[in-house]
Amino acid sequence: MKALSTADYIVFLVYFIVIVGYGLWIYNRKKKETESSNDYFLAEGSLTWWAIGASLIASNISAEQFIGMSGSGFKLGLAIATYEWMAALTLIIVAVFFIPVYLKNKIFTMPQFLNQRYNGTVAMIMAVFWLLLYVIVNLTSILYLGALAISSISGLDFNLCIAFLAIFSIMITLGGMKVIGFTDVIQVFFLILGGLITTYLAVSLVSDEFGGNGILDGFSILTTQAQDHFQMIFSKDNENYAELPGLSVLIGGMMIVNLNYWGCNQYITQRALGADLKTARGGLLFASFLKLLMPLIVVIPGIAAYVLYQHGGFQTEMLQDGSVNPDRAYPVLLNLLPSGLKGLSFAALTAAIVASLAGKANSIATIFTLDIYKKTIRPEATEKKQVQVGKITVVAAMIIAIMIAPFLGIDKKGGFQFIQEYTGFVSPGIFAMFILGFFWKRATSNAALFATIGGFLFSIFFKFLPGFADLSFLYEFGFAVPNSAGIYEIPFLDRMGFVFIICILGMYTISTIETRNGVKTNGLEVDASMFKVSPSFTVGSLIVIAVTAALYTVFW
């Protein structure tokens, strides 16, 4: 691959100076305000709707999207965009039903909600779990994939890239949630602009290769040259059905993935929890619109790379250890860009990685400081001391991630799949615990413990069940398909759906028995007026729903 030119490094350096300079300016201007732990962790009351929306997208779109989803676009096609388009609908649900509950009860963190709704045992178990999940799964995978992409594009040493990303992310994070929120506004601009330019040039290259004229011809050529890559819903005989199993991407496990991620995720929700309800909802709606556009940036380039590869392009660039590695699609396309533009796109990718790392590190610090340190280690800690502990936690988490990232086998599994699989072992139980905790006053603490621990154990059970039982009878219903060895396995998303149903039924049974025996619960007061939305929000939501329905109708 071509190395970065001097012009590329200049563009990248300008970006680096702008981001760091702006972050430091915000930090110094708000230094007194960040002495408050609420302001450090949440940017309380200071983020606008557009800053919240931009921060949500910048923190969500990272290496696993740019590298992983482009790679999935190369392999699976447009169907992988269901993660983005279903997220657009999910954000509306979260804005209407979840955020009002958090704000009314002044919830700063997810463990705080669990402590208030259930008890300290449930909250502490989940706080420890989230710390382990964020550090071992999320932080490491983003760090590893980000370094891999930057190393592939720039030619720099992989370990040096990991160190650079960690240090840069720490610098951004130490300013607190306020710095992250407002630097995200700059980063999301570079991110989307660079991604759109990459998509434009990639599709234009397809057009040129096939004698077309412009980007519209290029897109038309993509749909004809790779018809199998423009199907949103796979049938059972599709070789990729196990990854995206039919209608489960609409009404099954995919909704659990998205609702858990966007509604029960400290890393995401804290961007909206530092605002009033109207502002928070506006931010989530803005993010929903941006989600509809994300496949243009993270999926279409992968499909373009696939078409070019199938017709003789990138025959060596796409190879890794002698076989095709779909995750190389986006770095390959970036290396086709002219000097300057390549540096801009490289900066956009780096922006996505750093924003996600910084946000994740801040969430780790928030949970450890407010829900472990403050409650069990030093309850008398001052506001200033809590902020100091949070900053130390950021550095410690990043050091741990640097040390273990190369040894987790992320490269073999693929970053996007790595994150989805390992979070999927616990997300059904977490979502069941949250959804009943929100809207059913009789849910008890023991029922929540069942969902937390039982959900994890049942996920393991269904994962390894094919090794002990013949599941071919499930094929007729689309709940099992044969792998390369002929063994029938339950698709990942269906497995999540099964576990979620078990957790809901288990929680209902345990709660019903306990409440009949006199066990008291801490049910939340849910008022229907909490869920009323403004006319402008209603109109915006209907537009998102209509566009999503149209996309699925066209590409079904």
Region locations from a protein language model:
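Membrane-embedded helix-loop-helix hairpins and adjacent transmembrane boundary segments
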Residues: 1-556
